[in-house]
Amino acid sequence: MNPNNRSEHDTIKVTPNSELQTNHNQYPLADNPNSTLEELNYKEFLRMTEDSSTEVLDNSTVKDAVGTGISVVGQILGVVGVPFAGALTSFYQSFLNTIWPSDADPWKAFMAQVEVLIDKKIEEYAKSKALAELQGLQNNFEDYVNALNSWKKTPLSLRSKRSQDRIRELFSQAESHFRNSMPSFAVSKFEVLFLPTYAQAANTHLLLLKDAQVFGEEWGYSSEDVAEFYHRQLKLTQQYTDHCVNWYNVGLNGLRGSTYDAWVKFNRFRREMTLTVLDLIVLFPFYDIRLYSKGVKTELTRDIFTDPIFSLNTLQEYGPTFLSIENSIRKPHLFDYLQGIEFHTRLQPGYFGKDSFNYWSGNYVETRPSIGSSKTITSPFYGDKSTEPVQKLSFDGQKVYRTIANTDVAAWPNGKVYLGVTKVDFSQYDDQKNETSTQTYDSKRNNGHVSAQDSIDQLPPETTDEPLEKAYSHQLNYAECFLMQDRRGTIPFFTWTHRSVDFFNTIDAEKITQLPVVKAYALSSGASIIEGPGFTGGNLLFLKESSNSIAKFKVTLNSAALLQRYRVRIRYASTTNLRLFVQNSNNDFLVIYINKTMNKDDDLTYQTFDLATTNSNMGFSGDKNELIIGAESFVSNEKIYIDKIEFIPVQL
């Protein structure tokens, strides 16, 4: 099934607001053939100035590519870790149906997606060769999965030497074919255009290599052969990750510009490559079953931005500049949750008072830090203050999984056109009560020329097999707006995070729990949050100055988790050797020895990160527990970057 298809009842059809009672003519210039608006009457103007940039959003091929990327990440997040082995064949069948469905070609969609984003084409010879290689990979991989399914269904006592030789042969053929085909997805001059294709093929290859660790000796491979496959997997994990991050940055930097329109294209590339490439490579380390010998509970804390809510191509030149938008986006910060939005509204007059409308002119945002702090954070004010009554929506911890925003325009005979957002529906889901509801910002006045922007068009659900409130892929966590030049209106846009984020920092009783360090509720003065390198799924904690206590967390445990004890492991990069410590509410005090992994001038790459583990373990009491990370004997001006803390159950 195409993961981006939606049933008819999920599609919002926008029509002029029939509930709004107006007595004035909606199109004053259309009645007078001698009145001109840049030599067009009003109706013609509205018809011809529809935003051409929406063509990208309406491209079904691009939507299919994004939907497939989201679906693949969602499927893998649900099974990472060794329990993978128990449900492996059913996972592979679902995975195959996603990346090689019978009714579509996601690989062509991945290629077309980037062609649209950067306005370049892959040469036909390179595309044809890549597609031919992919067809061969599909055949090899399907043959292997079918053989694996038969192998697993056959009782141990009935497995023959012939069947053992056969599955080993099919595995080896598929693995070598992937290894030999990968250069076809990294052809010189087309590396950026092939990026999602490369990432998806690399992911499939690493999934396959993992099976040598799960089944290798069972299939008759020697321990030396299994070790060789393992070292190949580690080497390729680094190689594939670095390739994706490097060419993502090349592509992104190539789209930097100076105008509003340049920023929209830049942000689309950033968003769609995050969904189809960067989110995927975050998962590569989990295929190392020697490190992740249990299931894994993890989360993606990165932010992505949907398109600004802007409907008229004619007004592109009045948008804010590239730098003004990029510089006003929130800097890296501790993770927080959307609590509420205070909407300010102003009147936009139309021609001689006609076709006037109220619009979203500015806003405050209220957020809550990660569990552990009860304070509310109020954002700076964005936009223009109200001339109309202020509206405040409180989301109170519920997850907003969809927004539908309506826009309106007012046109004047002198050629000036004004834009505004008149209404936004926020669909929210309370997963504690399993209830859905909708809250609405409504400016209370529009002139009937309405277009709509639906967040689902840019952030499709993980699957269409469940209702949207269960299958959504992202949740809203921030809103900003920018003033247009020449006071032509206000442009709002939304920030989203992945649905995998756990509001409560819950430690699992049976899985390895990854807690991103940005989920802390407090930092020391010597620590800060910096932008992540692209393969961590979020931002990093950076320590540059001496500090005993670095970060404070609160974690949640159920009764089963309270019976466990946990080893603690930290993923980090460092320019020095030092000792970290982890302390909990029970006063368990664990020391972690950190080794130097990089020099001060080195860039952060996959290879600069390492894992360090405590020698002893800790337990918890009570369902809420404090946790502190600190540093001993840290020398100022050295650098340490912390990505995640992992809690590994040791007593099942």
Curated annotation (Swiss-Prot):
Ranges for region Disordered: 1-33, 433-465
Keyword Repressor applies: no
GO molecular function: signaling receptor binding; toxin activity
UniProt effect for mutating K624T: In strain: EG5144
InterPro entries listed in its UniProt record: Galactose-bd-like_sf, Pest_crys, Pest_crys_dom-III, Pest_crys_dom_I, Pest_crys_N_sf, Pest_cryst_cen_dom_sf, Pest_cryst_dom_II
Stretches with biased composition (Polar residues): 14-33
UniProt biased composition (Basic and acidic residues): 1-12
Substitution effect: S451G: In strain: EG5144
Family annotation (Gene3D superfamilies): Galactose-binding domain-like, Pesticidal crystal protein, central domain, Pesticidal crystal protein, N-terminal domain
Mutation effect (F352S): In strain: EG5144
GO terms classed as biological process: sporulation resulting in formation of a cellular spore; symbiont-mediated killing of host cell
Keyword check for Methyltransferase: no
Outcome (variant: Q21P): In strain: EG5144
SUPFAM superfamilies: delta-Endotoxin (insectocide), middle domain (SSF51096), delta-Endotoxin (insectocide), N-terminal domain (SSF56849), Galactose-binding domain-like (SSF49785)
Keywords: Sporulation, Toxin, Virulence
Record note on what altering L590I does: In strain: EG5144
Substitution effect: K600I: In strain: EG5144
Family, per entry: Belongs to the delta endotoxin family.
Function of the protein: Promotes colloidosmotic lysis by binding to the midgut epithelial cells of Coleoptera. Has moderate level of toxicity to southern corn rootworm.
Subunit structure, as described in the record: Monomer.
Note in the entry: Toxic segment of the protein is located in the N-terminus.
Protein name, entry field: Pesticidal crystal protein Cry3Bb
Organism: Bacillus thuringiensis
Name of the gene this protein is made from: cry3Bb
